[in-house]
């Protein structure tokens, strides 16, 4: 899955590059993920190139924001960013590659899906995916770098919406309440019903629940 926004055109339809004021001369994209820890569902990553001419007030780490504020900021980012792309790695890819490599893959897809080619990717965390452009890992970047904050919001809101859709198919697990994380409610449902096709069988609690129903 990848959702990308085309750049807004300037004179003659040429894209207007967004420059990060903290990195003069660079076209910077912020990159973050959502869903490394859950027991179910894909891992989702987003890459965002903000437009300094259209600042977005209130950007922060998505985990520090209420769901209502995340939804509002999601709409603002989609409307005002110069470019964005949301991508994912599937449960099958997570189980095959492991969650770290699947996360790097989702991030790579998000950056490569941007309609504006950045010169620098600022990645939340302590490691970067393999990219064709320069990249910089920033621990806690989702609370420090606006473009990473924006990516964090797009990734989390998108993933939360995906899990709400999964809840419609598998209401017994309560995906709409915990987004696939290993809450007591989710673990109890796993023990009672066993895992579904959207559970990550490479994760120990899911593997244990699968063994119980064999």
Curated annotation (Swiss-Prot):
Known cofactor(s): Mn(2+); Mg(2+)
Gene: rnhB
Organism: Burkholderia thailandensis (strain ATCC 700388 / DSM 13276 / CCUG 48851 / CIP 106301 / E264)
Protein name from the UniProt record: Ribonuclease HII
Lineage, broadest ranks: Bacteria, Pseudomonadati, Pseudomonadota, Betaproteobacteria, Burkholderiales
EC number assigned by the record: 3.1.26.4
EC class of the enzyme, as a word: hydrolase
Gene3D superfamilies (alphabetical): Ribonuclease H-like superfamily/Ribonuclease H (3.30.420.10)
Family, similarity comment: Belongs to the RNase HII family.
Family annotation (NCBIfam families): PRK00015.1-1, PRK00015.1-3, PRK00015.1-4
Location in or out of the cell: Cytoplasm
Annotated GO MF terms: manganese ion binding; RNA binding; RNA-DNA hybrid ribonuclease activity
Residues the entry annotates as binding a divalent metal cation: 32-33, 124
Reactions this protein catalyses: Endonucleolytic cleavage to 5'-phosphomonoester
Family annotation (Pfam families): RNase_HII
GO annotation, cellular component aspect: cytoplasm; ribonuclease H2 complex
């Amino acid at each position: 899955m990848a959702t990308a926004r085309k750049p807004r055109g300037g004179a003659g339809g040429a894209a207007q590059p967004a420059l990060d004021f903290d990195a003069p001369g660079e076209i910077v994209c912020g990159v973050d993920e959502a869903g490394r820890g859950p027991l179910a569902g894909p891992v989702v990553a987003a890459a965002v190139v903000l437009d300094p001419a259209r600042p977005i007030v209130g950007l922060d780490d998505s985990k520090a924001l209420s769901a209502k504020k995340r939804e509002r900021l999601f709409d603002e980012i989609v409307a005002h960013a110069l470019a964005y792309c949301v991508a994912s790695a599937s449960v099958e890819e997570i189980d095959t590659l492991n969650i770290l490599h699947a996360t790097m893959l989702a991030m790579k897809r998000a950056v490569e899906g941007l309609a504006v080619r950045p010169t620098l990717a600022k990645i939340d965390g302590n490691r970067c995916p393999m990219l064709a452009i320069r990249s910089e890992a920033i621990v806690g970047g989702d609370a420090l770098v606006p473009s990473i904050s924006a990516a964090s919001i797009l990734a989390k809101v998108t993933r939360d919406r995906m899990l709400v859709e999964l809840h419609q198919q598998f209401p017994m697990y309560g995906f709409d309440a915990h987004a696939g994380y290993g809450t007591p409610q989710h673990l109890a449902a796993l023990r009672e019903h066993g895992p579904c096709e959207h559970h990550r069988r490479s994760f120990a609690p899911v593997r244990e629940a699968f063994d119980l129903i064999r």
